[in-house]
Amino acid sequence: MGKYSLLLIAFFTCSVYGQVLTGRVLDEKRTPMGNVTVSLLSPKDSSLIVGTITDKDGKFSVKSERSDNLLKITMVGYTPKYINCNQCVELGDISIFPDSKLLSDVVVTGTNFTTKGDKMMIRVPEDVKKNTFDGYATLSAMTIPGLNVDLINHTVTSKTGEVLLCVNGREVEKGEIQALNPKDINRIDFYQKFDPNHPSASAVIDFVMKNRDSGGLVYGNARHHLNIGKGDGMLDVKHYKKNSELNFQISGNYGCYTLDRGEESATSMAFIDKKVIKTSEVKNSIFRSNHLRNRLSWLTQGRGSLFQISAFLNREHDVNDQNISQAYSTMGGEILTRDYTHKDNLSPATQLYYQRKIGKDGLFRTSIYGNYSHTDKFRDYTSTSSFWAKTEEDLFRVSPNMLVGLILGKNRPFFYATYDYKSTRNKYTENEVETKNRLTYGNGLFQIGNNFIFSSKFRVTLRFTENVLSIDNGNSSWTKFYFSPSLLCSADLGHGNTFRGELYTYVNDPQLAYYNGSSQQMDQYQILRGNPDLKNGHCMGGEAIFDSNHKWGMFELLTQYINMPKYIYEDVFVDNDKGMFVHTYRNGKSYNHFLFNTEIRFNVIPKKLIWMVGGEYNFFKERDKRLSALVGGTDLTYLGKNIIGKVELLSPFRYLAKGVEYKNPFSLKLTLKYTLKDLQIGFNATNPFMNNSSVETNYTADNYSNVAKTYNPRITSNMFMLTLSYRISYGKKHNFQNIEMGESQSSGLLDQQNIRNEKMESGKK
């Protein structure tokens, strides 16, 4: 009956320019199908004109401004259907049927999760779209084992390394994910190991978006702490015209508050003629800050090509006025110390980006990013002895890159190249004594490889990488080459089970600041100095991941081992002639880290309540230090009527990094958000009513030791925050997203206030 209806419509419906093509998509059982892709193509070359997806009732509407239309209906696991709908407006019911050959490559493991090749395709349910308001909240609500989504700092991390965030296959910055409308998400692709469009990435999250029925989009977000003068906000405006997009985004944060507690430490320093024990407590520290970030970009898209130009300006202003109570074993009484710092930064940047399809679904992509950064920092330290210091830095950065990826039968060869050039000139003045320093840094990466598709259930990716590293500090220079191969495999074991493994090598390259050889005074007895002679370690590692996906939930086992020779660690030694202890960085013995992690996700109440629980064992060996640590965590996610709530618990955990032992406290995070159409009101809390939560560090060297506890009340503990988001849209249908710019700000300065603030090492590919 549906076929005859379609023929009658084709014969008797008149062509109307600017009309809307409508229809309904059904499966082989004549059940309406949601999330089916409907594309309007040009009959001449089959190029995409516009597209959409069906709603939960299988209905769709596509606006057409021409009389000859070619409609393509596609759904994973189904045979694509093409319809010549000349002079058609109402298409009626359209049935599509399963493709037995295609289904052999797809493993359906649950209602919302499908595994195909190297990726997991995640269908976002309508209840999640309805109750979340941005990309981060949507990803968090899906509760995917192996992914950690931080809704406060807007970050996504995994145990296997950094997670690259994309929209429709294009790398984007976090502001774009924050402004993303969950209602426009077609699906989310999770590449745990290999993405052909980003072959050097450890893991990729790609938001596949549908077209919007709007000529513009305005998104605003504001957050403010309830018990401290601190907050941030963002305004994102997009305007579309034909095949182009103009985007303006402004974001920033502010702070004006006083902390009554900070770092509390005890330091022991043994000189040749005396031993000094110093105790220190930071009290009543005043913080003032305002950061402003502006971005303007223009994007145009042609047949299979895309070009974008972006401009960026960042301004930062920070004031930290610390009042410290100190005591020394060599003198009696309490000493009141003031440590005042004032920092300003200006950083403009620009980027050109171009990509084009080549061959059959191949890709050519190139971009160049440039950045200039100027930093002024002033410090006034008043104690038993006083000093003032001023630092000025000018940093230039250029970073081009290129990717060529092809599809040749069952092979996906690729070539990727990038180079990061940085040049810093800085001047450090202390008590009118001036020291100048310059440093030029280059890091090139050239990678070639292939993704071998042996069958629908087994793939292997081989990558060969050549790293070129160069350093020039004005007095000496060197250039070194490192060859780093890697081997990945993915296997479908059936019944919802998959295995992914990797053996890899990489170069452990320290940050630019560690090479800075200038000296900075920390206090009466301590100096911080970089090391221009640091070496690079040729590291290796391996990891294996087993996933088991079912309708009741998901289960993941992960194990990882990394070995880093010539590991960079903090070294402290005494200079008895000057009566000072010098903090610097050196290469030491190897660093070894082994972890075993497991996480289980339960659909406690389908579409309502999700519970995930996990545990991890870590073993660290760094030079002569060894550390074993267990950590456990759990989170509970609730989705209700326009409400999403989440509770996250993490037990205390310890780790080693650069010679320092860290102990992070118990962590509790609460999230509650209510959505009403285009408005969302939210509440976040971190470690509520826990005023004594602190990060502990412990460092010991010859003749020196330091034990410290760092408190951050009302920011990382006893923190309460209110959020408000609003979104409006208008006009015609378009679908473009921003390309990610490089780091908006770089610096080659060692900051003594950030010492002992290292993260746990993870594998890098």
Q: PLM ranges: what are they?
A:
Residues L235, L259-K275, V319-I335, T350, ...:
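Outer-membrane beta-barrel translocator domains and adjoining extracellular loop/strand segments
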Residues R30, D57-K59, T79-K81, C88, ...:
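Membrane-proximal, glycine/serine-rich, low-complexity loop/turn segments characteristic
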Residues T22-G34:
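Structural motif
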Residues L41-S47, L70-I83:
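A short, solvent-exposed loop/turn motif at the edges and junctions
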Residues R397-S399, L439, L445-Q447, R529-N531, ...:
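Outer membrane beta-barrel strand-and-loop segments of large Gram-negative receptors
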Residues H342-S347, Q351, F378, T382-T461, ...:
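Outer-membrane beta-barrel transmembrane domain signature of Gram-negative proteins
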Residues S200-A222, D321-S325, S367-S373, F378, ...:
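Surface-exposed extracellular loop regions of Gram-negative outer-membrane beta-barrel proteins
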Residues K44-K59:
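Short, acidic Ser/Thr/Gly-rich low-complexity loop/linker segments typical of extracellular
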